[in-house]
Regions:
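Active-site/catalytic core of tyrosine-dependent DNA strand-transfer enzymes
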Residues: 1-8, 51, 70-119, 124, ...
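Short alpha-helical segment immediately N-terminal to, or the first helix within
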Residues: 28-29, 132-136, 146
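Short, polar N-cap/turn motifs at the start of nucleic acid-interacting alpha helices
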Residues: 46-53, 117-119, 138-158, 181-187
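Hydrophobic, well-ordered secondary-structure elements that form the walls
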Residues: 71, 130-133, 143, 159, ...
Length: 188
């Protein structure tokens, strides 16, 4: 997504007339740079509010390994808003039928309705996150770990098990502050 699309996303999100949990899910994806499917099937027991962490089990991850993600103050605020809507259930974003969780397609349709440009989907948040973080000098290992990418160097992957939580916590808070500024000022 371009800077203009980020600005437009927040303009459109303010006027979004769909289900409030859809809007909150899109915010969660933007703030954490997670994959849409990871947000769609998120469960309340994966979130640790005291330590501000989201622990996703390997079975739910593309790379099939556990993933821990720090939570920014803005993500905590999104989750607290969401608790009033879906906090009594298992899933953050339950399916409208009451069975299981929402589908990533619902999120894609919501973004399509925002007319952000051809091919703009919830997954597109990962590109501006990575680009912004790299351009602003954050450690590449922290960026890749946050994106839950698998290390391509097999030897390095075998030995390097660092989670870089402190660095990623700073990175995600700075990213969230950047997005909040974009939302508040209309510029990114």
């Amino acid at each position: 997504m371009t800077r203009e699309q980020i600005q437009r996303f927040y303009q459109e999100l303010r006027g979004y007339r769909g289900y409030p949990e859809t809007s909150l899910c899109l915010r969660l994806i933007a703030l954490t740079a997670c994959r849409p499917g990871e947000a769609a099937d998120a469960e309340w027991d994966e979130f640790d509010f005291e330590d501000a962490l989201w622990r996703r089990p390997a079975a739910k991850m593309k790379a099939r390994r556990d993933h821990v993600s720090p939570l920014s103050a803005q993500v905590i605020a999104v989750l607290k808003d969401l608790q009033h809507i879906t906090g009594d259930g298992r899933y953050l974003f339950p399916h409208r039928s009451g069975k299981g969780f929402t589908t990533p397609n619902r999120l894609t349709y919501a973004m399509r309705d925002m007319n952000l440009g051809r091919g703009t989907t919830p997954h597109c948040w990962r590109t501006p996150f990575s680009t912004w973080a790299n351009e602003n000098g954050y450690r590449p290992d922290a960026i890749e770990r946050q994106l839950a990418h698998v290390e391509s160097n097999k030897v390095r992957a075998t030995y390097n098990k660092a989670l870089l939580l402190d660095q990623r916590r700073t990175l995600l808070q700075d990213w969230a502050d950047y997005l909040s500024a974009a939302e508040g000022s209309g510029t990114a």
